[in-house]
Amino acid sequence: MMLFAGIDLGTSGIKIALVDENGACCATAARASPVDIPHPGWSQQDPDQWWHLTVECFDELAADHPALMARLKAISLSGQMLGQVLLDKADRPTTPCILWNDQRAIAECAELLERVPDIGLRTNGQPDPGLTAPKLLWLTKHAPAALDTADVLMLPKDYVRLCLTGERATDITDAAGTMLMDCASGAWDDELLAAAGWDRARLPPLMQSCAPAGQLRTELCRRWNLQDAVLVATGSGDNYAGAIGVGASVPGRAALSIGTSGVLSAVDASFHPAPDKAILTTPHAAAGTYLSMGVVMAATQSLDWLARLTSTSAADLASLAEVRAAAGIAACPVSRPSITGVRSPDNRPDASAIFSGIMAGHDKADLAYAVLEGVAMQFYAAYQAQRASGVPVDHIQAVGGGTRSPFWVSLIASLLDTEIAIPAQGDISACLGAARMAMAASDPERTVEILGMQKPPLLTVEPVAGLRDQLLTRYAMHRRLAFTP
C-alpha cells in the first residue's frame, strides 16, 4: 500500500503526517515555529524557518520510519493563509512574512476601499489588515526595498512547496485571501492588483488545489532514501485542508475549527457572498464547490492569553469554567474576547477585548467561563450571518485544540442547536486533508471519493437541554459589547 504525506504549515508549527490509501495516519512528526512580535499588533515569521523545520520533520520520519517513507508516493500541503512571501529572482525572501493576525495595515485598508469602492463585491470581503493586499501597501510605505527587489508574491505553503520542487505556484484557495483575485471568477483581477501596487507579471501560476505542481527534488529523494519519483500536489489554505480532512467536500457538510483562530467552514454548491458580514466565500479545494467561512480571530488564543495572565494552564481553566457553569451562569461576566480584533460578522480589526459585569467575588473560573462563552458566541454570530446569506451549515465536525474541552464544544452546539461530531485525529485534520489532496493528484478519477471520505466520530456532542435559552439571553448582552469602542 502506498503512502501520502500531508504537510501542515501552521502559525505555531509544522506537522507532517504519513497517511495510507484508506486515510489512516501511520506516522507523524512536528516542530514548533515561534512567532516574532517586534511591536504591539505585529506578527511575523521568517519563511526560511518553515523550510528548516519541514526538513527536520522529514529527517525524523526517514530515520524512525524508513519502511514507511520508502512507500511515499505523493506529498501535498496545507498552509496558514494571507501572509505575503516576497521572493527575489533567486527565490530568496526579501522580508519577513507578515502573518494573518498582524494589525499594522489598518490605515491601508481604508486606502484600498477608496481606490476600489466595489472591492467587497469582487473579493467577497472587506479590506482587513490580515489580508495580503493591505500588507503590500504598508510595505510600499515602510519597506520599499523589499518590494523593489521582489520578483514574485507567494503564500506561506507555496514557499515550502517551492523548496520541495523548485517550481513556483499557488492555488485558488490561498489566492482568494489576498484581495487580488476575483472570487466569483477565480482569476487574478488587474484593477485590484493595481490598487495594491502589484502586477500580474510578479504572480505565480494559479492552480487547482489537487493539481500536480512538480516532483520532489532529486537531492531530497536521496536524503530521505525514497525509492521512486514523488509527486507534489499544489495544496490549499489550512481552513480548506482542514475541511477536506474531515470529509467536508460536498454541500451540506461543515467543519468547525477551534484553533489559534476559529473558523466555521460550510461547503456550498452555489456562490453566496456576504462581504458586508465579513464572511469569506471562495472556491473550495474540492473543485466545483465553494467554501463559506466565518472567522473568529482569537479562539484558543483567547484562552491561552488568560492562562498566561492567571498562571494557570488552558486545560485547567477550561475545567474550572465547566465547574463554574454547572453552578449556574447567570452571574458570570460577559466577554468579547477579541484580543486580536473582530472579523465575522462585524469586521472590526481595531476592536479590543472587553469583560462586562466583573464583581469583587468573581475569580479566574468566572473569567475562564466568560472567555469560552464569548468565543462560542462569536461563532454563533458568524453562523447566523452564513445562514442568512443562504449557506447550508449542517453536519458539523469540530477540529482543533479547543475540542479537547467537550464542554466548550457543548456551548457552541447549544447555541447552534445542533449536534457537533468530534472526529478521531481532528488535531491533524489539515495534515489529513493535505494527504488526501496528494492522493487525488495521484488518482484524479477518484477525487470526489477521496476528498469525501469520512470515518465514525470519536465523540458526538449534543446541545445541552435548557442551556440555549440562557445563552441567548446572555448573547443579547454579548452583541451589545460588539459595538462598544
Model-derived regions, located:
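N-terminal glycine/serine-rich phosphate-binding loop of ATP-dependent small-molecule kinases
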Residues: M1-T95, T149, C221-R222, L226-T234, ...
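Active-site core segments that coordinate phosphate-bearing ligands/cofactors
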Residues: A5-G6, I106, A110-Q126, G130-L131, ...
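Conserved small-residue
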Residues: I16-L18, G23, I75, D102, ...
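Structural signal for short hydrophobic segments within the conserved structured cores
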Residues: A27-R31, P204, L459
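Gly-rich Lys/Arg/Thr-decorated short loops/hinges at beta-loop-alpha junctions or inter-strand turns
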Residues: P34-Q44, I119-G120, A169-A176, D199-R202, ...
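Short beta-strand-loop/turn "lid" adjacent to the catalytic site in phosphate-handling enzymes
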Residues: H65-W100, G125-G130, R161-D182, P205-Q208, ...
